Amino acid sequence: MEDHPGFATDLLFDRYQGEVTDHDAFWTVRTPGSPDYYFGNYLLLPTPPSDRDKGWLEASFDRLIGWDPRIRHRTFQWPLAAGQNSRVAGFVAAGYQYMECVVLALGAMEWQAPTGSDLAPARPFTAADWDQWLAFEL
């Protein structure tokens, strides 16, 4: 997962704010301080699951993450290769919500620095800007 552009970034932040553990068949990601954070408490699978995997995945989640009574969800994530499909109708029939997240990445060879005409005007922050910035952040 370390070379997948989306998951590598997620795992960077997951390690910063929580725990990432590599198991034989998947990774566990836990954010103990945020039990209701679906994408901070999940199993990360190397390949898409099938309906046959539902039982052992749920048991693994419950044993490694869901033992905390504050966690009242199960979340599984996995990468999809181009043209690959997930076969998770059994999960959906059991009440799981299926969603796909897309990652757009541009390699160093394709990246072009913006030209002067592409740049938006910018100014440094002043002391007076900070109150407005803090209000915006909340």
Model region roles, listed by residue range:
Residues 1-69, 82-84:
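N-terminal charged segments
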Residues 68, 136-138:
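Helix-loop element at the rim of GNAT/NAT acetyltransferase active sites that forms part
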Residues 51-130:
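Acyl-donor-binding surface of acyltransferase catalytic domains
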